[in-house]
Amino acid sequence: MEVNILAFIATALFILVPTAFLLIIYVKTESQNKKN
């Protein structure tokens, strides 16, 4: 089975970018909640 590298990279970015974005928001809100 041949895998298109560009398609694999695009899929990885499509999954990782929103996940990292949500994690950053989550960490920021958690740190703010701990300070308050």
Swiss-Prot record:
Belongs to the PsbM family. The gene is psbM. It is a single-pass membrane protein. One of its GO terms (cellular component) is photosystem II. This is Photosystem II reaction center protein M. PSII is composed of 1 copy each of membrane proteins PsbA, PsbB, PsbC, PsbD, PsbE, PsbF, PsbH, PsbI, PsbJ, PsbK, PsbL, PsbM, PsbT, PsbX, PsbY, PsbZ, Psb30/Ycf12, at least 3 peripheral proteins of the oxygen-evolving complex and a large number of cofactors. It forms dimeric complexes. It comes from the Eukaryota. The chain crosses the membrane at residues 5-25. It comes from Panax ginseng. One of the components of the core complex of photosystem II (PSII). PSII is a light-driven water:plastoquinone oxidoreductase that uses light energy to abstract electrons from H(2)O, generating O(2) and a proton gradient subsequently used for ATP formation. It consists of a core antenna complex that captures photons, and an electron transfer chain that converts photonic excitation into a charge separation. This subunit is found at the monomer-monomer interface. The lineage of its organism: Eukaryota, Viridiplantae, Streptophyta, Embryophyta, Tracheophyta. GO terms for biological process: photosynthesis, light reaction. Keywords: Chloroplast, Membrane, Photosynthesis, Photosystem II, Plastid, Reaction center, Thylakoid, Transmembrane, Transmembrane helix. It holds the Pfam family PsbM. It is found in: Plastid, Chloroplast thylakoid membrane. The keyword Thylakoid applies.
